[in-house]
Amino acid sequence: MTDEQLALFPKGKPGRGSAGEMTRPVATLPANLTSNSSLAAAIALFYGHMIRQGFSDNTVKAFQADLRLFSKYIGSNRAIGSIGQADLEEFLTWMRSARGVPCSPKTYARRMTTLKVFFAWLVESEILPFDPAAPLIHEHPSTPLPMILYDDQVNALIRSTRDLLWAPKPDARPYLLVSLILQTGIKKSECMEIRPEHIDFSNPQAPVLYIRYADARRSSKERKLALGPGFTPVYQQYVREYKPRDRVFECTARNLEYVLEDAAHLAGIEGGVSFEQLRWTCAVRDYRNGMPADQLRQKLGLSHISWRETLPKIQRLARPAL
């Protein structure tokens, strides 16, 4: 294997490994729902919409609870077409200061997101002519920017793990793992579920990774991601060394975390390296290299809701120093 074969980010190909295609459920229009329908009826149909779109269980439960609270305040029989911006603002004020129950900034932000997503769905479905939640100002709770690897740390990590390919006792796993996450930005859980048949080597110079989910409700997160030409020879060496059968990584997730810790030590990176750190590093590098925002969202397998909070952080990390 040559250095050219193992190049992780080939020159002249910004954003390589970014196919990020995502399968989406077919949209279904709410049956028999009009602007005169009750809020309760709309909420019931919105539940089905969330399931079809692959919202996570936690998101579905949280949104349903938020809408129940809103329905209790404004009236479940209220016609959805009669709900205006002033009604939403009064609800938010009541929830924050007059309800008598503590409402943290994070909870407040989520409930506003619930209203925005709910009414945006009604407008997109042509049930309402305008969105009363659109003018609401979203106040995201301040959270620290995630830690990413600097360019010199990325280079050191790649170099040190690549050297293990030719060590007296060769080990392809560290380099395969590091390069895979830096190229694709997949989650730890997704990494653990990769099976050999999920990687298409029809074109060895442009292999493709398919991210699959057994749960049909997660189908919106399924996607195909391009891998660089250097992935093929490293994967072949890894297969010879580890002989995976059922899954590509047939160890525990904790074991792979140890692999990253050892790799960070070899690279001289203090504080270690985590899956999440590599995922954020991938996202920032792709955005900095000109990948369109929505393509990056699809590549990371994020919903539009999660993206509202994630994109500003990526933009702040990718922009030049002041």
PLM regions: where:
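DNA breakage-rejoining catalytic core of tyrosine-based enzymes
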Residues: 128, 141-159, 218-229
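Basic, Lys/Arg- and aromatic-enriched nucleic-acid-binding interface segment
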Residues: 156-188
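Catalytic-site neighborhood detector that most strongly recognizes the C-terminal catalytic loop/helix
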Residues: 148, 300-322
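Active-site/catalytic core of tyrosine-dependent DNA strand-transfer enzymes
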Residues: 226-270, 282
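Alpha-helix N-cap/helix-start motif at helix boundaries, enriched for small hydrophobics
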Residues: 60, 115, 177-178, 185, ...
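Short basic/aromatic active-site micro-motif
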Residues: 172-173, 253, 270-290, 300, ...
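Conserved tyrosine-mediated DNA breakage-rejoining catalytic core shared by Y-recombinases
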Residues: 193-231
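N-terminal core-binding DNA-recognition domain of tyrosine recombinases/integrases
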Residues: 26-32, 44-145, 164-166
